[in-house]
Amino acid sequence: VQASETDDLKTLIYFGVRDTESQEDDIIESCKIKNYRVHEMRHRGFEVCIQEVLTKLTEVDMIYITFDVDALDCDLVSYGTGTPVSKGFDIEEVVMIIKGIQSTGKVVALEVCEINPLLDHKGNRMAEAAFEVIDSIF
């Protein structure tokens, strides 16, 4: 990643990324991308972490949210995603994060990705969980 490209990443924020490769870790570190880890948010408090995010995004005109369902705890919800990893967020926590960001009035899009019903050992539970999140925030 070149220095000129890192300016575009200053407002990129991750929540709950838990399964990365060393190359990804290097980019996250070198570009100073904040990853709010699940245990960090639970320890520090969701409100505190979300307020930090809102402060960081004050100069941003538009916010685009990608909700990758593998941020959800696969043991609590489902393995119906490309990268099922335990110790993730529960549905209520994801809703809290998205609603907090929505409170800015700057969210222009919400993308939901990584649902894979072929890997879902609970029927179509991961898709149902995604719909629960969407239903709760709109």
What are these regions (language model features)?
Residues 1-138:
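Conserved alpha-helical scaffold segments that buttress catalytic/binding sites
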